């Protein structure tokens, strides 16, 4: 059994880098780039990754961003640290995908739910709930796509934590993040873990 697996959600240029279509400054991005990624590179740890394809059409959300083949779609996670194949979602919840997800094309399909394929991706990437001690999630944003991912993992029986320094709420406000990670609804499905706690967990026998 693996002690833990890392899962990054939506750390893409359109969300995380100045000039992105949906960019807001969030301190966690600096932490990931300057502290966390160098740490996992030194430790040789792979990162599982979920990214978004938010091209139109997407009923209920008129944003048009994270377009495959464009800069805004690209992830901040270095290719050499990425573990296996990315899962590409089309809504907040990772069970939503589309025909042509991640493929540069003019007419991508409408979003649809595919929980079976998402579950198969999880099994291939991190194993079943009995194969991994915990899944540590980070990325953007804690109160939207990260929360939706945490819920989906918890409902499938995984133990889930969120790396507090490596996520932010949509506004980027640190007091709001602290409140969000310390109580409901977040604590119904996951718990916050600090970078120091994660380092100790990895050091004690990943």
Each PLM stretch: what is its role?
Residues 8-10, 49:
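A broad, low-specificity signal for short, low-complexity segments enriched in glycine/proline
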Residues 37-56:
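Von Willebrand factor
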Residues 13, 17, 56:
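Active-site micro-motifs of SAM-dependent methyltransferase domains
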Residues 2-5, 12-14, 31-34, 38-43, ...:
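Active-site-adjacent betaalpha module
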Residues 58-63:
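Metal-dependent catalytic neighborhoods of phosphoester/phosphodiester hydrolases
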